[in-house]
Amino acid sequence: VIIIAVLFLTACQLIATASYARSERKHPDLRLSSRNSKLSKRCLGSREQCVRDTSCCSMSCTNNICF
């Protein structure tokens, strides 16, 4: 029974992987736009206005100014 379950799960994983690869080939523009959106995110430099620590390169936002 365990062997059958392992084979079933392996087959499901292979099917999902093949489906994802096929989807990437059909819609390459979506893949590029998601890659570009990741590359375009940047952190705020010193003395720029911020709202939270994670937006600053230094991870320090005090009184809405990056330090």
Curated annotation (Swiss-Prot):
Residues 18-40 form a propeptide. The presence of a 'disulfide through disulfide knot' structurally defines this protein as a knottin. One of its GO terms (cellular component) is extracellular region. Disulfide bonds join C43-C57, C50-C61, C56-C66. Belongs to the conotoxin O1 superfamily. Transmembrane segments: none annotated. It comes from Conus abbreviatus (Abbreviated cone). Coiled coil: none annotated. One of its GO terms (molecular function) is toxin activity. This is Conotoxin AbVIN. It is found in: Secreted. InterPro entries: Conotoxin.
